[in-house]
Amino acid sequence: MKNAAELWHNVLSVIEEEQRTPKASYDMWLKSTEGVTLNGTTLIVSAPAAFTVTWLERQYLSLLEDTVEEVTGSRLDIQFIEEGQAKHMLDRQNEEVEVMEVAPAKTKAQKTPKSSDELVMSELGQLNEKYTFDTFVIGSGNRFAHAASLAVAEAPAKAYNPLFIYGGVGLGKTHLMHAIGQYVQDQKLGTKIAYVSSEQFTNDFINSIRDNKTVQFRNKYRNIDVLLIDDIQFLAGKEQTQEEFFHTFNALHNDQKQIIISSDRPPKEIPTLEDRLRSRFEWGLITDITPPDLETRIAILRKKANAEQLDVSNEVMLYIASQIDTNIRELEGALTRVIAYANLVGRTIDPNVAAEALHNIMPASEPRKVTIRDIQESVSKHFNLPFDDLKAKKRTKSIAFPRQIAMYLSREMTESSLPKIGEEFGGRDHTTVIHAHEKISTLVKSDGETGKVIEQIKHELKHS
């Protein structure tokens, strides 16, 4: 504990002396933090209040972890907790120290090794205790996904298997996955639950091949009761990993084990995903989450304010909810910014303060970035084509020309690489994208009608 305190003191000294953050910000957010304990590769740090914890996680985590690495020479994870939690943690550690002082020393033979189940679970990620069904705000955009998740939690491998949840970033997919895991864990003691991202699954698989431990890898992932795998779209293009996940999926499904999957898009729209995997994802239930409406956004803000015992008026919540209309993470982040700003300037939180906070503390909002999917949807709508035709293998002129326009716009309006654009159009080769771009570029110069179509679609994309 002394080491953690000294380490954190040194980290703060570096930041303050080298002015890595403005003095006012340092005094407001960092000065009152303290190193609590070092738990393995995780440094526990206390902060005065819940909103401070949230602010530090959002705004300073990268700076602090980089500085810790600079001071110690090792990369440590930082976990922020409230002062009350820190006190409880220290009291508990002190009790353990007292017991250890009066108890006879144990020999190595007396140590109880972790069971294989405990080892597997510790290696496969932890559930976030904040993400439960009780803390999930239900609205029109997520009602069905919530109901399906609860049904799966109440009857794993009996209701819908697999359950596939898709939707944009920050809309609550991960929350529901953790809620399922927490519910099953509470209701069915001893159930083996694993929550992993597709990236972790991929890395574990690669490491198992490198270390010649594929048998252990398979035992780890196939001897569980509930598998929650996040962001499955990142398996796209990874043929060997897809092969391994296919067999993992089959093993679990055949053993009547529950599988829950999340993605930013439905299975049929994940590029270069093997058909056999896509078909298995469609065995169970596919449900989406859409951006919350105004009433739901206000309810989300109210729940967060109540959870952190903050007094925020309905007028302020209405203002914030009116400004942030797509992403729950940004919505909650905006509330945190408003509270932080009010504390910093010593004013009561009202709509005027909220407006100042979101104007001054949040960076000026950049124009929304156009995505390849946005372009595909606009082109489909403009030419009155089914969306899937742009990705299909059809080469008729009525489809090939709009597809080439969409590829051209993807090259002009996004930062995506040629292979990435090709992937999003049914797994086409990058040379196809180059050909499409060259052809439409020539037509724009020589054919006035093509130029008008391009400008019209661009205008719609920029003002949608």
Curated annotation (Swiss-Prot):
Residues annotated as transmembrane: none
Recorded superkingdom: Bacteria
Keyword Membrane appears in the UniProt entry: no
Keywords annotated in UniProt: ATP-binding, Cytoplasm, DNA replication, DNA-binding, Lipid-binding, Nucleotide-binding
Region (Domain IV, binds dsDNA): 343-464
Sequence positions that bind ATP: 170, 172-174
Subcellular location, record wording: Cytoplasm
InterPro entries linked: AAA+_ATPase, Chromosome_initiator_DnaA, Chromosome_initiator_DnaA-like, Chromosome_initiator_DnaA_CS, DnaA_C, DnaA_dom, DnaA_N_dom, DnaA_N_sf
Renumbered residue ranges of the record's region Domain II: 82-125
GO MF annotation: an example: ATP binding
GO BP annotation list: DNA replication initiation; regulation of DNA replication
PROSITE patterns registered for this protein in UniProt: DNAA (PS01008)
Coiled coil: none
Positions of region (Domain I, interacts with DnaA modulators): 1-82
Domain III, AAA+ region: region residues: 126-342
Cellular component terms (Gene Ontology): cytoplasm; plasma membrane
Annotated function: Plays an essential role in the initiation and regulation of chromosomal replication. ATP-DnaA binds to the origin of replication (oriC) to initiate formation of the DNA replication initiation complex once per cell cycle. Binds the DnaA box (a 9 base pair repeat at the origin) and separates the double-stranded (ds)DNA. Forms a right-handed helical filament on oriC DNA; dsDNA binds to the exterior of the filament while single-stranded (ss)DNA is stabiized in the filament's interior.
NCBIfam families per the UniProt record, alphabetical: DnaA, PRK14086.1
Family statement drawn from the similarity comment of this UniProt entry: Belongs to the DnaA family.
Subunit (UniProt): Oligomerizes as a right-handed, spiral filament on DNA at oriC.
Domain notes: Domain I is involved in oligomerization and binding regulators, domain II is flexibile and of varying length in different bacteria, domain III forms the AAA+ region, while domain IV binds dsDNA.
Descriptive protein name: Chromosomal replication initiator protein DnaA
Gene label: dnaA
